[in-house]
Amino acid sequence: LIFVANFFFNVIAPFYLQNARGLMPNEAGYLLMLFPIVQVVVSPISGSLQNRFAPELLTTVGLVILSITQIGYMTATLSTPLWLFGTWVGVMGFGNGVFQSPNNTIVMSTVSQRDLGVAGGMNALARNLGMVVGISASTTVLFASMSQAYGKPTTTYIAGRPDIFLAGMHTTLTVAFFICALATLINLWRYLHRRVQAK
């Protein structure tokens, strides 16, 4: 689910930064690079924290952070300061970094050592499937919402009408927020369930 939500943002962000805000491709790229840069720094730290905290707790914290960033994106307009948008991108990278490492640990800890290769393959499959679903679902929701706001079908950014795109963007990122929220609730249930079993 979280890969689906992440790719909603990956599809929307270039349209917002380049078409709606008028940034050059390299400028938009520099801003979006904050996500992987922060994630690279945070992921190993999150991995080391598993010695002190339950992986389920860390993944829940990461998902809560990711859900909050979706709210930030949902409120973005043409007048939103780019430093604020960049902050949300960095916070999203932080949340993803907190989530990824302990989530992989949880997946791998549920299988025997001889099945680790299969589990790793299934984990990669789930990740790639989430990416594909995220791309297809986000574009479907985006252009359906834009078409509704425009009053007729459209499958591209409408020049000179950033308001149409923003309407579609807000709807699309609202869907992404609910996906993140659902993933958070599922993960929280998993954490509480394991705590009950441990007693």
Predicted feature locations:
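Intrinsic disorder in cytosolic terminal tails and internal cytosolic loops
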Residues: 157-160, 190-199
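12-transmembrane solute porter fold
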Residues: 1-148, 167-192
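Short, membrane-exposed interhelical loops at transmembrane-helix boundaries
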Residues: 152-168
